[in-house]
A protein has these predicted regions:
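Beta-propeller folds
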Residues: 5-8, 17-358
């Protein structure tokens, strides 16, 4: 009857409300915990800077000294408060167990061919870092690099992996303790034996090989002392020839005030014909230069001399270059130009901008 149905509906709503209140109670941390937190007192210094005649106080300048005992003590005190709160959250274990269950499945990347081997990344489910495997001629897979074994505490990670033209040599960068300052290790890709001393003090860098002779990488002059907070605003592009000491690496770009950029990257085209150099002063917008690697001592030729767009090389076919750009095209387009006259006035649309984002 209608009355019976109505009573059943009301009973269902009542049970639902009780369950929601129960779940809310279980999922909400105790409010008393947050009200009882005693935050460490942060000392205020007396540093004052003057910019354009105006005095600007900077009372926490002392925290920029990341190597000082006082800063270390401040960090320990902050961590004690933070983890003191996090550790008492009643449903923290439930969250961890749920995430563990969701993440616990095998993950395998797309394969890629280098030399005589086919490489791929694999994670058995709960490994902190993906492992690099390889196979040869359909044989059994073997581990090539396992970043989980790079350090005892597991804080050293694999950042970049790149192979020489014939796949016989590999260069990979590692980050220790989460630092942006990295080392590049060079190994025989067949035997996995280290070939030379690692390159050190490398930061915000890719690895782009020129044939089998060496590779381009980027870094800053490493500051002394406060590595974690010192200003790094002049990136430099170098070429490392295999067998040479790092101090002999050739500076390609970024060494002068006119070439000053916060970020500089170098990319060698697949046919080893051109080096493409991209420079940025922020995280958006880049200028662009090109160098013919087949001509000894060839000059750097400007493609773009401003930062009004994000423009990147897709590929080249002989001397014809293909760029993806948003220059005067917010939805992006693909343009083509000959490397002999690569400036923007010579660009031709290959795929024009449309109402859809490319």
């Amino acid at each position: 009857t209608t009355k019976t149905l109505l009573i059943a509906m009301l009973a269902g709503l009542l049970v639902s409300c009780v369950e929601e209140k129960k779940e809310a109670k279980e999922s909400t941390p105790a409010t008393t915990a947050s009200s009882e937190i005693e935050y460490p007192v942060t000392r205020k210094g007396d540093v004052v800077d003057e910019y354009f005649g105006r005095k600007i106080p900077d009372p926490y300048r002392w925290l920029e000294d990341d190597r000082s005992d006082e800063t270390g003590e401040w960090i320990r005190a902050q961590n004690a408060v933070t983890f003191g709160y996090l550790n008492q959250i009643p449903y923290r274990t439930k969250l961890r167990d749920r995430l563990k269950k969701l993440w616990d499945y095998e993950k395998v990347s797309a394969p890629f061919k280098e030399g005589n081997f086919t490489y791929f990344y694999r994670n058995d489910g709960l490994q902190n870092q993906n492992v690099v495997y390889r196979e040869k001629d359909g044989g059994e897979s073997e581990i090539f690099l396992d970043p989980n074994t790079f350090s005892e505490d597991g804080t050293t990670s694999l950042a970049t992996l790149a192979f020489s033209k014939d796949g016989s040599i590999a260069a990979y960068s590692i980050s220790e303790g989460g630092s942006d300052w990295r080392k590049i290790i060079i190994v025989d890709a067949v035997t996995k034996q280290v070939l030379e001393d690692p390159l050190v003090d490398v930061k915000f860098s890719g690895i782009s090989w020129q044939g089998n002779e060496g590779f381009f990488y980027s870094s800053y002059d490493k500051p002394e002392g406060s590595e974690l907070s010192a200003k790094t605003d002049q990136h430099k592009l170098y070429f490392h020839r295999l067998g040479d000491e790092q101090k002999s690496d050739r500076l390609i770009y970024g060494g002068t005030e006119a070439e000053k950029h916060r970020y500089i990257s170098g990319y060698v085209t697949e046919d080893d014909h051109y080096l493409i150099i991209s420079g940025s002063i922020t995280t958006s917008g880049n200028d662009l230069l090109i160098k013919d690697l087949t001509e000894p001592n060839s000059p750097l030729v400007t493609v773009l001399d401003h930062f009004d767009s994000d423009t990147y090389l897709i590929d080249n076919v002989g001397s014809k270059l293909y760029f993806l750009t948003n220059l005067d095209s917010p939805n992006r387009k693909i343009v083509t130009v000959d490397a002999s006259e690569p400036t923007e006035e010579n660009w031709q649309d290959f795929i024009s901008e449309t109402e859809n984002v490319l």
